[in-house]
Amino acid sequence: MELTPREKDKLLIFTAALLAERRRARGLKLNYPETVALITAALMEGARDGKTVAELMSEGTRILGRDEVMEGVPEMISNIQVEVTFPDGTKLITVHNPVV
């Protein structure tokens, strides 16, 4: 199976997000890469579900709380930017202060 670099990136994000979901379900606090992957995957799936850019930007701040991530992680992530494919094309989503 041949995958484009973009498809490989999507699979890597999905895999990291899946690991983060499992760790979160066990009550573990997420580290920086797990936090970014989980939020990024949620944004990508939201676009697939038909949500708008504005909806995703708003929802992106409610995916994880400060109590679900390791100390210092919220301060490390001032924003997350993701290029997401919508039915009408690819758009850049920016979520400011994603972990509140």
Curated annotation (Swiss-Prot):
One of its GO terms (cellular component) is cytoplasm. It catalyses: urea + 2 H2O + H(+) = hydrogencarbonate + 2 NH4(+). Its EC number is 3.5.1.5. GO terms for biological process: urea catabolic process. Pathway: Nitrogen metabolism; urea degradation; CO(2) and NH(3) from urea (urease route): step 1/1. One of its GO terms (molecular function) is nickel cation binding. It is found in: Cytoplasm. InterPro entries: Urease_gamma (IPR012010), Urease_gamma/gamma-beta_su (IPR002026), Urease_gamma_sf (IPR036463), Urease_subunit (IPR050069). It comes from the Bacteria. Keywords: Cytoplasm, Hydrolase. The keyword Hydrolase applies. Belongs to the urease gamma subunit family. Heterotrimer of UreA (gamma), UreB (beta) and UreC (alpha) subunits. Three heterotrimers associate to form the active enzyme. This is Urease subunit gamma. The lineage of its organism: Bacteria, Pseudomonadati, Pseudomonadota, Betaproteobacteria, Burkholderiales.
